[in-house]
């Protein structure tokens, strides 16, 4: 496997909280997919700080993925086209739709690694895109 893109992003939780207070649902709709919004509002009804962490981690993941693509949020990419899900063990993974899904195919991306973390003030994500090529070692 060859790495074809790496993206890292860190988000300040207090900044996200201020944005939510200022823009509310408008910001949430811009960042989250339909299914992510459902989960966000469930969490928000239970405990506010958990919902802020949830939103911040999704934003960090989507920003990191856009960096791994090497495009930022261009070429018709929107955050709502990236969905962060968790498997039955809690490991996060992406589900891509529309333009993002087509870009995955066009770039021959065969493996996607996503790692999320949060700690008191920050949420962080790392994304690695790989294809099937063999790494070449130059000597």
From Swiss-Prot:
Keyword NAD: no
GO terms of molecular function: holo-[acyl-carrier-protein] synthase activity; magnesium ion binding
Organism: Wigglesworthia glossinidia brevipalpis
EC number assigned by the record: 2.7.8.7
Compartment list: Cytoplasm
GO cellular component: cytoplasm
Binding, Mg(2+): 9, 63
Role, per record: Transfers the 4'-phosphopantetheine moiety from coenzyme A to a Ser of acyl-carrier-protein.
NCBIfam families assigned to the protein according to its UniProt record, in alphabetical order: acpS (TIGR00516), pantethn_trn (TIGR00556)
Family named by the database record: Belongs to the P-Pant transferase superfamily. AcpS family.
Pfam family, one: ACPS
InterPro entries: 4-PPantetheinyl_Trfase_dom (IPR008278), 4-PPantetheinyl_Trfase_dom_sf (IPR037143), ACPS (IPR002582), Ppantetheine-prot_Trfase_dom (IPR004568)
Catalysed reaction, written as an equation: apo-[ACP] + CoA = holo-[ACP] + adenosine 3',5'-bisphosphate + H(+)
Recorded superkingdom: Bacteria
Protein's recorded name: Holo-[acyl-carrier-protein] synthase
Alphabetically ordered keywords of this record: Cytoplasm, Fatty acid biosynthesis, Fatty acid metabolism, Lipid biosynthesis, Lipid metabolism, Magnesium, Metal-binding, Transferase
Main EC class the enzyme belongs to: transferase
Cofactor(s) recorded in Swiss-Prot or TrEMBL: Mg(2+)
GO BP term (any one): fatty acid biosynthetic process
